[in-house]
Amino acid sequence: MEKYFGEKQERFSFRKLSVGLVSATISSLFFMSVLASSSVDAQETAGVHYKYVADSELSSEEKKQLVYDIPTYVENDDETYYLVYKLNSQNQLAELPNTGSKNERQALVAGASLAALGILIFAVSKKKVKNKTVLHLVLVAGMGNGVLVSVHALENHLLLNYNTDYELTSGEKLPLPKEISGYTYIGYIKEGKTTSDFEVSNQEKSAATPTKQQKVDYNVTPNFVDHPSTVQAIQEQTPVSSTKPTEVQVVEKPFSTELINPRKEEKQSSDSQEQLAEHKNLETKKEEKISPKEKTGVNTLNPQDEVLSGQLNKPELLYREETIETKIDFQEEIQENPDLAEGTVRVKQEGKLGKKVEIVRIFSVNKEEVSREIVSTSTTAPSPRIVEKGTKKTQVIKEQPETGVEHKDVQSGAIVEPAIQPELPEAVVSDKGEPEVQPTLPEAVVTDKGETEVQPESPDTVVSDKGEPEQVAPLPEYKGNIEQVKPETPVEKTKEQGPEKTEEVPVKPTEETPVNPNEGTTEGTSIQEAENPVQPAEESTTNSEKVSPDTSSENTGEVSSNPSDSTTSVGESNKPEHNDSKNENSEKTVEEVPVNPNEGTVEGTSNQETEKPVQPAEETQTNSGKIANENTGEVSNKPSDSKPPVEESNQPEKNGTATKPENSGNTTSENGQTEPEKKLELRNVSDIELYSQTNGTYRQHVSLDGIPENTDTYFVKVKSSAFKDVYIPVASITEEKRNGQSVYKITAKAEKLQQELENKYVDNFTFYLDKKAKEENTNFTSFSNLVKAINQNPSGTYHLAASLNANEVELGPDERSYIKDTFTGRLIGEKDGKNYAIYNLKKPLFENLSGATVEKLSLKNVAISGKNDIGSLANEATNGTKIKQVHVDGVLAGERGVGGLLAKADQSSIAESSFKGRIVNTYETTDAYNIGGLVGHLTGKNASIAKSKATVTISSNTNRSDQTVGGLAGLVDQDAHIQNSYAEGDINNVKHFGKVAGVAGYLWDRTSGEEKHAGELTNVLSDVNVTNGNAITGYHYTGMKVANTFSSKANRVFNVTLEKDEVVSKESFEERGTMLDASQIVSKKAEINPLTLPTVEPLSTSGKKDSDFSKIAHYQANRALVYKNIEKLLPFYNKSTIVKYGNLVKENSLLYQKELLSAVMMKDDQVITDIVSNKQTANKLLLHYNDHSSEKFDLKYQTDFANLAEYNLGNTGLLYTPNQFLYDRDSIVKEVLPELQKLDYQSDAIRKTLGISPEVKLTELYLEDQFSKTKQNLGDSLKKLLSADAGLASDNSVTRGYLVDKIKNNKEALLLGLTYLERWYNFNYGQVNVKDLVMYHPDFFGKGNTSPLDTLIELGKSGFNNLLAKNNVDTYGISLASQHGATDLFSTLEHYRKVFLPNTSNNDWFKSETKAYIVEEKSTIEEVKTKQGLAGTKYSIGVYDRITSATWKYRNMVLPLLTLPERSVFVISTMSSLGFGAYDRYRSSDHKAGKALNDFVEENARETAKRQRDHYDYWYRILDEQSREKLYRTILLYDAYKFGDDTTSGKATAEAKFDSSNPAMKNFFGPVGNKVVHNQHGAYATGDGVYYMSYRMLDKDGAITYTHEMTHDSDQDIYLGGYGRRNGLGPEFFAKGLLQAPDQPSDATITINSILKHSKSDSTEGSRLQVLDPTERFQNAADLQNYVHNMFDLIYMMEYLEGQSIVNKLSVYQKMAALRKIENKYVKDPADGNEVYATNVVKELTEAEARNLNSFESLIDHNILSAREYQSGDYERNGYYTIKLFAPIYSALSSEKGTPGDLMGRRIAYELLAAKGFKDGMVPYISNQYEEDAKQQGQTINLYGKERGLVTDELVLKKVFDGKYKTWAEFKTAMYQERVDQFGNLKQVTFKDPTKPWPSYGTKTINNVDELQALMDQAVLKDAEGPRWSNYDPEIDSAVHKLKRAIFKAYLDQTNDFRSSIFENKK
């Protein structure tokens, strides 16, 4: 519009997208639970499973079951807990107007992100395993997490990656629900289902047949630890046809011991001695016993099954009953006795055995026993054995003579019965080397007083070279079974040995090493255990290779039938002898797994059945002459002999500090326990890979076709579920027979490395590979075989016979698919009733399908990216290809067309298929493309989609009409048809130019241009939230071929469009079909398409297998967590060593109480990664626990052991070894460094790795500077990386070469990955830099098997889009979170903070670390201020809390702010907004860079923050409680990208682009990636943000702009009470001239100053017409009404006086010049088509009309207003108008049809505020508060297809005043009359005389209205008689205006901003 009468015009343009909260994406997910074979196992175990489901997925009945609490304990069997999580609230997003100049506006296209609203349910399923063992096959879903659930109950749709399973015992406490970023836990639903067990035949035969019937465990090991009291049945596995009976032996576990209070000593009776002997017999003897109701057979668990399968003729089944008596061991109680010397143990009361008598029914067939079951049982309870433990400190020990061993009964774990000796257990050697005579006591200790006391069986009685006894350190408290393996041979001392060397010659017991609790103990014969009932053990391997690791935990347990193969004969107990004689018969001993006395069996190596393992003592050989040297580990026949060490053991001192490691054999500790030998052991093995090097090239072998000539070029990669990969050189490869088939045995060797086989430890590490199998032709169990076969014959028929892993096949960067040629055959994913999947596709499976058939196939966890058109199954299908029952889940990202299944389907059909996941194409291109949830482009008469669905989130950026996006298909043309299908999810399309919709983007056939050949839709539904698109189709035209289309009312379907130079967002009702309520959607989907996804078989790769310590000697059940923690401290040591040190941990230690996640070496406060370089300087160890607490211990290097650095851990007595072997890394670094340093950032090689073309700039990566820095420090980085990566157990050229090869082949990706992490993670927590933790310590959160090298390479390969700086939050989630064992970036940052700064809040840490200048201005209202201090809540104004909120759009700001290299950015945080700007926005010649600029910016930032605070304090005070709560939100404020320099004059005007070198742009605004559209406006709003353009945030005019733009962001939902804008009123109506603050304090407008504080001392005080200080004037809504009401007292009075002067003093023609009339006109709204919104039109008066104006009332009745400031013309709706303070609008013009015009609406709104207040007067008038009332009265309009109530002026008048006034004219007359009635009470006032020339200071005083009327008459006449120029300005040219201003100012000051009225006796 034109500028009238000097009015200062400020233009504002609409830029709001009104997007509210949206429904959550509803997804389907299917799970399975696979059961295993029966087991002879009576222990009860509960499996617990957690999973999530959205609240929207719950039925109303299910919601009623919600329990608002957390689950507590494991209760019944097979239950499910659905734990409910609610998504935190999200901001509504909207597009709002511009504010600024009147110049032509640029078109703005603002994208709005749709927020997902949902509630998650985390489900828990519990399975009790009683009498049966269940094998759980874990379905790998989502990003790879395993879920274990039953196929029923609720489906979980969101965040399935959180699904977790646990194995707990009944009564155990359930885990707490996880904390999930952005979600809040609210309760749970419990559900139960009994899981049946399947019996699985065991058809495998052992490789070596024993001479007697052996015992083989039928138990199929589940993925959880059995309870210690598990009863194991042992049976041989024989061929199916065999019917030979099997003998069954079962070992029952005795009770564990525990400590009790001390009691007095009691004498042992001979009866007790007998009981003790029997007790010891029980510790070894295998009692024959049958589990209750457990049937055992020869080959199957049920003989009848063999008959049914045709394997046997049906025999006669007979049974007989026998009585079996079983001894029950007694418990042992330990009591402390302060009168006994510390370490002394004596028996107070011997235990008595109990017994159990069972009647067993034995079934037989053909006289051969096939099974047994228990008929009845009776039990006699045992009596406990009480042992006293001394606690009195021992000072001196005198030598005692050796007389013999203590125990005359069988030891725990022994195979032979020792000779019975007198009670004296030990011989102490004097300084003369002669044995002293010891009194007849069980164990004697001589105190410093010469008194004898009972001495424990301690090996640590040390005698010095002077013959004087050494001090004995106190024993660590041991709460396990004291009665363990004891020394059998006397200790002898010679003079030749030095001090502190205890020489002892114990019987060398078998090596005590751990047994897997899940496996039975077998004898030393070749037995194949059946751990996997689904397939033979040799097939239980990964898809990449068939490897059977030679460990019992890996299903094979293969041991040579030759007892001397790999091991020597089992060590035998020796008779002790009392001389120094050399033992001629000394033999080596096998290191045999010690079976706890409570579990398992112990066998010899002979093939005979060991029914009675206790052999007579006379059968044993003696070995008394052998002496073990503790310090050297040497075994010598003479005391001075020196030989290589045999065994090593580290035995810490008993005072809690570790000693130097003593390389000893199995020594005996002070409490009589046998010390384990320290060895290396690879635990938790999950996969084994064989590699070889040929001519410098490395390849993996999944099979072998022969024995290699040279095994030196081979090595093994051992993968673990808990620890890093270990590379071991191959020592030998031999051919053997296994199960009748030839296989290759691979033996890998490393120093001290042993492997557990058949409950024994043998040297080295072995496993098996198949002979190269014939190529699979039809049924495939290998993905590589499938790909190879199809590529060779693309027309064949192929079946999946197992789920396949696409990781088997490596594709080059330029390869578009796995199968290159066009496939014309059949691919079927189902075989024998089982459905299989292909997992982990990185590219489309096929390039093209032509006439092919693909059915019953699932593609799981696809992660496909490509430049061109891509689909998961194929890029294109043509010529009648049929795709049926194909289901895909995962992520696809492309730069062109993308389809969940196919990019294009030409004359091809898809039926009963689905896609679930994300599709991303935000690439900006002008090329045509099509994106669809199932198919990008569906074309052709025979092309169809039927009975299918897509659950999809699509991110797109269409900017052309030939770019289409659809929930099911993008483009559907040439008669293609979609029917009986639906889509659900979200489509976020940034721009509005493409064709986008929830079902199909576009139906028109561009090829023919004919309507009849367009695509067709029948019976389809859209449950998709769409930004910039429609619900059903993206384009509507007449004659569309659509029928029965439906959409959800709950969906948010919005378009952002340009209207009248304004960007507006409007809900789309075009192509919505039949709109259904949310409650109808679920049933409609089921009606359209009841598609159920199949349950598919998981990958066959081994799952996680935790180390089991329960069968290790000295295991204590209450220390299970301790052992798990010590395992992390000693990652490569054997289980016996771990148990040993675990038993040293005190109960008050955190290692005892909490789960340890990781251990990090440090040098002071710096993290150490390069262990080799810092081996001896490391001095601290940080222990990080699962609650993210931490503690530090002093660390002291001790020695190297088997290429491991070994450290003492403080004074704990514990050891620590890093999770890395020591090897030569320098040679690797030296070889790869030159090639890495040659790389150039702008090179083609880098671009190829990023996947971009040469024309794409690398700017938005913001990595160029860092790339150079990274190359400078590359040598150190590589050393750290290699130190943190895979362990090289032997320093071998082949394994080193493999690493060299990997680095060279991936050098670009590695360097990009390093550069990325060094750029964005270079910040500190206190003194600790987190960069090294992120790069080199991915195990910090407990995921110990992550490879840092692979992680960096994969990050570098992840592509340009993933490495964009703006995607840093998603990049962490996609590429790093799973590798770190974390969930998301912000939880990771918080967890780091908890570890390193536990007493600092996230926000305080953030502020201390960022170089941005941050101002957080809290409210002056106390209750608000208190809330704003609540960290982590929606109320917090902490910057970190706000930008990490799930509702914040720019969470990617965190890392750029943390890594700012200099102070270049400021941040302002207040109640409702968060502002960001650059210092250089204010840089100029007046404020040059440096202190001047910094001080200016920071001072004004603080002042701006206070203004913004004051503005929302004002609104908080006047709003009701409900609306106040909505003020706590975060609206983005951005200063323009306009930066000055030291020469800039005034404001900077040039826009900086993303490639600007300005530090604020390069380090913050650019990386955040918000491409702000710049224009010539003052500012503009986008619903979720405000962007300052010509105005600047920190200036005063920026404050006024703030009130304008924040009105646009606040009016509908907050200021207007949530009722929304009244239909027809544009957004500018509510800002300028209504709710926005005035531009200047002197503005003569009816407005409210809500933001600026003025002062009486201001230079502008004389002209101020607005409130002085809003923070003081407005304390509540009543104050606001009081102010406006009293102001209108004056306004009405002056308007009345002016009106009287005009009607009484002016002529007709003078009236025509002084007045105008206002009318309404109605124009059809171009957006919604309605014609009920008034446009105000101001017109000149005719002479006839002027003649009618002869009274004041006539001015109201004839709709008159002043001509002084209201020019003739149309006042268009949604304009920038203000109501003039001194130019009367007498009219009360209302809209007879509906909504008022912009002038009348603003004026009446303020009059209602004066009369009724804000909430009861103004809000009802300008909002849709009465919409429902209008609807009930039949006053409706149609808005975008919806019937809406039409609020009319008449309805508002009636409702607001309760019918008091019949017309608005009557109301206004009453308002004037109310003031006229007070004229007699007018207060005297003195004002500046406006008639005096400036600078005259003359004043005038009036005492009554008559005096004022006289002055008004003069002024009116003067204006009427004076000339009216074209540049007329009332401020200068109008006497009336100047008089009114003077009077108004005087009363404003006199009433103290209208705190009182101008009338007496009126407030």
Swiss-Prot record:
Give the UniProt keywords, A-Z.
Cell wall, Hydrolase, Membrane, Metal-binding, Metalloprotease, Peptidoglycan-anchor, Protease, Repeat, Secreted, Signal, Transmembrane, Transmembrane helix, Zinc
Lineage here is: Bacteria, Bacillati, Bacillota, Bacilli, Lactobacillales
Q: Which gene encodes it?
A: iga
Positions of modified residues (Pentaglycyl murein peptidoglycan amidated threonine): T99
> What is the protein's given name?
Immunoglobulin A1 protease
Location of motif LPXTG sorting signal in this chain is 96-100
Indicate the secretion signal residues: 1-36
Proregion span(s): 37-99
Q: Does the keyword DNA damage apply?
A: no
Q: What does this protein do?
A: Zinc metalloproteinase which cleaves human immunoglobulin A1 (IgA1) in the hinge region.
Residue numbers spanned by region Disordered: 253-305, 402-681
Paste the cofactor note.
Binds 1 zinc ion per subunit.
Q: Does the keyword Nucleus apply?
A: no
Biased region (Basic and acidic residues) positions are 276-296, 485-511, 574-591
Q: Which InterPro entries match?
A: G5_dom, GLUG, LPXTG_anchor, Peptidase_M26_C_dom, Peptidase_M26_N_dom, YSIRK_signal_dom
